[in-house]
Amino acid sequence: MRNTRPSAAQVAIAPRGLGVVVTEKGTSLIDTFSFRHNGTLDSAVTHASSGSTPYGFDISQNGTLVVSEAVAGAASSYSLTARGAFSTISGSIGDDQKAPCWLVITKDGRFAYTANAGSSSISGYKLDHDGSLQLLDSNGVTASTGENGKPLDVAVDHNQHLYALDAGNHVIDGFAIGNAGALTPVSSTTGMPETMVGIAAF
């Protein structure tokens, strides 16, 4: 990251040794780092994000990077390779929701979901084998976290369930993921602290 104020949003190691990815929300850039044989990282290769404010992301097992765009209200997908190649597949697919900050891909790689902190909602995308994205619901609302909802993060388990950390209502909402990507509410864990900021499922 060459910029002095990149405001990095997320960092993650890509599957299959494809390298390290960092989103810069302050510069609308995405950085990729390849691994050297000794485990250190090559210099960053910087790429322009398809939309403004790239934020949360996830990477499928086949190397498809899907990134939320918090200001644009959208998500984009990109192709990654072990040699550091980076190309846009689907650019800025809008969901008409506000502040889609965090994103997760299902374990089978078929769907991606964004947590829309400013709209009390979750948006779902179909993720095709070629990495292209298609919005599941025309209005962008695959699920709602209810009045005062503020989903800050999302996670999925290996049994086709999605969990949303709702800081507005201080709960963790659980949803079953249908065969076509629909989300059906199945649980709500109450009494969570106001300071909660992240969630993981396993």
Question: Where are the predicted features?
Answer:
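Beta-rich, blade/repeat-based domains predominating
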Residues: 1-19, 49-65, 94-110, 142-161, ...
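Short loop/turn segments immediately following the C-termini of beta-strands
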Residues: 16, 25-26, 35, 70-71, ...
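Blade-level signature of beta-propeller repeat domains, shared across WD40, Kelch, NHL, RCC1
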Residues: 167-202
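Beta-propeller domains
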Residues: 23-29, 37-40, 47-99
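Short loop/turn segments immediately following beta-strands, especially the blade-tip
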Residues: 33-40, 77-86, 124-134, 175-182
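Structural signal for beta-propeller blades
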Residues: 28-30, 73-75, 120-122, 170-172
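Residue position within the beta-strands of beta-propeller blades
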Residues: 21-22, 67-68, 114, 164
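A short beta-strand motif characteristic of beta-propeller blades
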Residues: 1, 42-48, 88-94, 134-145, ...
